[in-house]
Amino acid sequence: MFNFFNLSLRLNGFPIKEASVELEKILAVSENEYSNYINQKKKEIVEYHLKHNKSYQAFVGKNSFANWSELPIMTKKEFQKPLKERLSEGYPPSNVYVNKTSGSSGDPFIFAKDKFCHTLTWANNIRCFGWFGIDFNTSLQARFYGIPFDFIGNKKERIKDLLGNRYRFTIFNLSDAVLEKVLIKFKNKKFDYINGYTSSVVLFAKFLQKKNMVLTTVCPTLKCCIVTSEMLFDDDKMLLEKQLLQKYLAYASRS
């Protein structure tokens, strides 16, 4: 089958083949050498930013360091400034991957990564999802995320859904009547996995609980559920495991 997902990454400037090769090199680092490898990478990252990132230079207050422990700890509050003031030299806003957190902690967080770094994240996502039998090129995703209302943003997400083999459910209205339609869609489509906001997926699980129903009884192809890095309470985790699939529950950041 044609790899539409991999193609969409490449068309958007994300070199997935090269990133996969780099990931294999990282995974090949032996357990005995891993601590030294991490310390060396930490040193390289800090030295790079002290040399090429004016915002980080100002935050640290000097252009060199001797020990990791002497570096000040950054929080989201230190990032509350325009993105262009935080980017390193050679990385204009037009040539980086930009995203943001939900701000559920009280401090919104808009961040950027260079495209190779972000592709490396995708390469690792592909590897980890594979543990549960999920292939981004072929597996059907039930997606519980919002979508932009503006025309261009909306169409862009719809195209990504098409290429990524994703069916997107609305999260702006999750009344019982709407969730009943969601359930019908699960009965009629062979979804392989769920990916969405914690709050939205938990609400769907509570709806199923009221109906005394486990989702895999109507959608037996379902393999796993992935929720975003919002706070997931133990009770909610058990609820998801009980009402959705009784198999696996992965917990990861949105990418």
Regions found by a protein language model. Give the residues of each.
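Short, glycine/charged-enriched secondary-structure capping and boundary segments
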Residues: 155-159, 208-210, 240-242
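Active-site periphery "cap/insert" segments of enzyme catalytic domains
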Residues: 187, 199-210, 229-234
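AMP-binding/adenylate-forming
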Residues: 119, 140-202
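Adenylate-forming
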Residues: 201-221, 239
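A generic local structural motif
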Residues: 127-129, 180-181, 208-214
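Nucleotide 5′-phosphate-binding alpha/beta core
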Residues: 1-100, 106-139, 147, 184, ...
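Gly/Ser/Thr-rich phosphate-binding loop
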Residues: 222-255
